[in-house]
A protein has these predicted regions:
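N-terminal, membrane-interfacial amphipathic/helix-forming hydrophobic leader that caps
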Residues: 1-133, 283
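Transmembrane helix-loop-helix hairpins at the membrane interface
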Residues: 2-9, 24-34, 153-284
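Residue-level signature of transmembrane alpha-helical entry/exit and packing/kink sites
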Residues: 15, 19, 43-47, 78-82, ...
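Alpha-helical transmembrane segments with an aromatic anchor "belt"
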Residues: 71-77, 143, 209-211
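Alpha-helical transmembrane segments of multi-pass integral membrane proteins
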Residues: 82-96, 117-126, 148-165, 185-192
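Short, well-ordered beta-to-alpha junction loops that form the rim of enzyme active sites
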Residues: 91, 144, 273-276
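Transmembrane alpha-helical segments in integral membrane proteins
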Residues: 127-134, 199, 203-205
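Hydrophobic, small-residue-rich membrane helices and short re-entrant helix-turn-helix hairpins
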Residues: 132-148
Length: 284
């Protein structure tokens, strides 16, 4: 089955060379970021681990195939809704984190007018639209498939991070910031994992269906997700280069989480793996 998994991945690369080239370019830039920050070993380990997890995910999917699918009724219309939602979310992020705008000194009426856009920064607005379109949780990937995969991914991530880059571990910081283990889990799984993975599953399935190319829809969605972090990072040190490189740096882990969703046809494994990502191997 190991050989079959390698052949499966090779076939998928041949079928979608454009997506492969985009991933390869991202990997090259990620290695450059590691070199630039004197963390080349960490960046190489990070990239290898993301591929290794994709291999484990494919192996599991070949051994335990599922007939479940993601329902997409109107690809063009729903892709438009997805793009509109993230655009409105970006508008809020701009006003909230732009160094040229003092949020606290902003006119009260303007702030009140902008506050509803929070619904689109977090995908609450997107979720409401999916409900109005009569999608059920099962249609959007809320299934129990593939939960066994969270065990090797979390354990291997923790072990490798401890060995290769113990200084990048974020567990203690997250626990301190959120007031304890329960707070860290709630913040990670609900605020980050659920909201961001829901955003990505809607995007990659709709864009993929509209373009008739899952791989491209997958990459574009993760690219959007990654760069939605840029406004906040830029506001912290006003370094546009590092904000851009930082966004590119998290694309590989974002791709892995979204691939986990795609192959298991369930959002729950990626929500848990994302939400318990206290290791920080991608931080360099």
């Amino acid at each position: 089955m190991i050989k079959a998994t390698f052949l499966f991945q090779k076939t998928k690369i041949k079928e979608n060379l454009l997506t492969f080239l985009l991933i390869l370019t991202t990997a090259i830039v990620t290695i450059y970021i590691g070199y630039r920050h004197d963390t080349l070993k960490q960046s190489l380990t990070y990239l290898f681990l993301m591929w290794f997890f994709s291999f484990i995910i494919d192996l599991y999917a070949l051994l335990s195939p599922t007939k479940d699918t993601f329902l997409v009724r109107q690809p063009k219309r729903e892709s438009f809704y997805f793009i509109a939602c993230f655009t409105l979310g970006l508008v809020f992020l701009f006003f909230r984190f732009s160094p040229s705008i003092d949020w606290q000194q902003l006119n009260g009426i303007v702030r009140i007018a902008l506050l509803p856009l929070i619904l689109f920064m977090f995908p609450i607005g997107l979720a409401i639209i999916m409900v109005l379109l009569k999608y059920k949780p099962n249609d959007l990937g809320f299934r129990l498939n593939g939960l066994i995969l969270i065990i090797p991914i979390i354990l291997i991530s923790a072990l490798v991070n401890r060995i290769v880059s113990p200084q990048s571990l974020t567990y203690d910081v997250l626990v301190a910031e959120t007031g304890g283990i329960l707070g860290a889990l709630f913040s990670g799984i609900i605020a980050a994992g659920l909201s961001e993975e829901f955003f990505k599953v809607v995007g990659q399935t709709r864009l993929g269906a509209y373009m008739k190319n899952f791989g491209l829809g997958w990459f574009i969605t993760v690219f959007i997700w990654a760069f939605m972090h840029a406004p906040k990072w830029y506001s912290e040190d006003l370094n546009m280069t590092e904000a851009i490189l930082g966004s590119i740096r998290i694309i590989p882990i974002g791709l892995m989480w979204s691939y986990l969703t795609h192959r298991t046809k369930s959002i729950l494994p990626s929500v848990i793996v994302h939400g318990t990502n206290f290791w920080g191997l991608q931080n360099f």
